[in-house]
Amino acid sequence: MRRKVSLTEGEVQQVSAACARAMSGVDTVSGEYLSEAVLVERAGWLTGLVTGLADAVVREHWNHGDLARLASGRDGAGAGLPARAWMALRRLGWSAPVPAGRYLPDRVVRVVQEQAGRVLRSVWWRAQITAAVLATWPADPERRTEAEWEALRAVLPEDGGVVAGAVIKARTRQAAAYLKKHGRLPAGITACEEAPGVGGQVVLAAVDKQLATVERCAEDPFRYGVLTVRLPLRPDPVSRKDWPAVRIRFRIPPHVPADAALCLPTLRIRDGRLLLDVPYAHPVPKAESSGHRVAVAFDWGLNTLLTGGTLTLTGGAQPHVTAGARSVAFRADGVLAKGHRLRIQGEHLTARIERLSTLAASRRERGMRPDPWQSAKLAVLEVERDRISKRRSRLNTALAKAAARFMVDHALAAGATVIYLEDLRDMEARGKGRTLNTRLSQTVRGAIVTHTRHRATAHGIAVVIVPPRGTSKNCPRCLTTFRHHMAPDRSATGWAWATCPNETCGYSTGRDQAAWQRIGARGLTHQHTTRLDRTSDTYLIRTVIEALDRASTVLPEISDRTKSAPTMKRPAPGQRRGVPAPPGPRTPPPAG
């Protein structure tokens, strides 16, 4: 099983994932053919064992002390903890409690510890934010003063530079709800939240060939793969004989390269099917953080989700940025409106479910029998809410993939080596009200950036996040503060249109049109300050240098109209007929 690929100069290894469906299997001990239904049943037993034990490990160590020990990266002797979660848990002595009378191979216990360790490690970032919010609890949780914001930013993890304002507000609302219910502030995140679950899956990446192997099918290596994994014969295995190896055949998706190295998958059961999330490694061109000459930049919007264009950094002693004559726009009005409608329906159903749940709880407290009508209605509403949630999830996934493909395709067509975007995870339109801000927060910008970065990496294009402050405020050509109004022919103060008050400039354009030029110019002039965030594997420009930002004016691209050929001596023909004129008078006869 090969997990690494051979690389040449200028290439790096990218790990992607593809979802495959288990078709059939064969028991390697008895030679029995296993249908898909049998595979689903036996994989379900394995998933139940792993999930139950992993949840028990998470609940046992759901306290601030154990979370801090795991996040510190040091064991009791001061030695560094391994990067793999199951190794770190074993170093700390956190074992999985196997029930009496059950037999689980050591590699299955590895899977349990790996999934539990990943969940516990992922909690620490939220725990730090919650601790910072509680340590600097404001007088009014709904509105912090400037001094309170400064005190909070000083104690946030990673200098507070990458913590979105929406995350801070969510943690503040969570603590405020606890305070309202219990009359005191919580001690930490473990008091605010229940222990999280690990999900119904089996992560085989933590095991070796004693439990599972994956390889391409010998008969057709480009279309099919074979997973060999030990699955239990019964839901309560008691000996090693209850863990025979099973060869599972699956079809490799067509977008997986032929030279990609397959890695051990993650098993999931969805809608009566056994799904395999198969990671694969393949070589891609290396994306550089600096040295860019041609870039594309995009600005976020509401109905016009993305507005952007191409920018070029010229050479010479005084380099300057020129913007392309034409911009591009990704309009998703209908999709966003549909998502907004589904969100409203989901909120309405949630409110009805909460009312019915309150009524049912009230009847139980008074010793009354549950109302059959209420129970049936509650079940129907919960099913409908789940259905709408799945529709929203599918819609948002399709929107994120389409927007990512739009940006990467435009970058390829323009010959750009970098895509500049804003960090607007908590974008709010000031003075626009809660409804519009809710719609702005539901446009899956984080998923769009993730899909864009993944798709761009395959082509060696870097995706860099630029600080958003002031990109819509100043004119991209002279950096004078814009005057925003409603439309080109309506001077009333508004949002959509921007006009430069500088008489020598007078640039007038849409707000988003000016913003993407400022984003691209800021990225090109600050590209030497680009840094790689190791936690998210994202290129970031964390701070803006005022001198560079003031010099990052954008010049319009002017086509060369120099005369390159002599003037034609033959004059242009007049308005002549292409066919002979019809017989008869050329002027209409007089009336009457």
Language-model regions: role of each:
Residues 1-592:
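Nucleic-acid substrate recognition interfaces
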